[in-house]
From Swiss-Prot:
Belongs to the universal ribosomal protein uS7 family. One of its GO terms (biological process) is translation. One of its GO terms (molecular function) is rRNA binding. This is Small ribosomal subunit protein uS7. One of the primary rRNA binding proteins, it binds directly to 16S rRNA where it nucleates assembly of the head domain of the 30S subunit. Is located at the subunit interface close to the decoding center, probably blocks exit of the E-site tRNA.
Length: 156
């Protein structure tokens, strides 16, 4: 925590093609070594693949995938009297989006398809259908929170 004042969160400029701030955040998460134009190319081509396959709008498909991966609750470690408890905590809305995007990108990178655009498109399609590694990660986090429900009174 800063001593003087809280620093506000940086504003992310919307992406140039579709004007969506969430998509710009997704591109930034996908980006490696500052190569933003490459990340944009990958994301836009993945969205085109999804649009051809499903016939949906770009952003509708993207939002549907994010909705199915967003976690509602997670566990945080809390030390109480010499032992550490996994305390279930509700996830803030900004962190929900960030975690969902991060999990989708990680799952897409672990896939074994030809190009990153195809891997990302397949992971997004799987997420819209409640399948895939990103959705599995969300279910795992929810299961952990459910298993540690007894420690919810240690919330801070």
């Amino acid at each position: 925590m800063p001593r003087r004042r809280l620093i506000g969160q940086r504003k992310i400029l919307p992406d140039p093609k579709l004007g969506s701030e969430r998509l710009a955040k997704f591109i930034n998460i996908l980006m490696k070594n500052g190569k933003k134009s490459l990340a944009e190319t990958i994301v836009y081509s993945a969205l085109e693949i999804i649009a051809k396959r499903s016939g949906k709008n770009y952003l509708e498909a993207f939002e549907a995938a994010l909705d199915n991966v967003r976690p509602a609750i997670e566990v945080k470690s809390r030390r109480v009297g010499g032992s550490t408890y996994q305390v279930p905590v509700e996830v803030r809305s900004i962190r929900r989006d960030t975690l969902a995007m991060r999990w989708i990108v990680e799952a897409a990178r672990k896939r074994s398809d030809k190009s990153m655009a195809i891997r990302l498109a397949n992971e997004l399609v799987d997420a819209t259908e409640h399948k895939g590694a990103a959705v599995k990660k969300r279910e795992e986090v929810h299961r952990m929170a459910d298993a540690n429900k007894a420690f919810a009174h240690y919330r801070w």
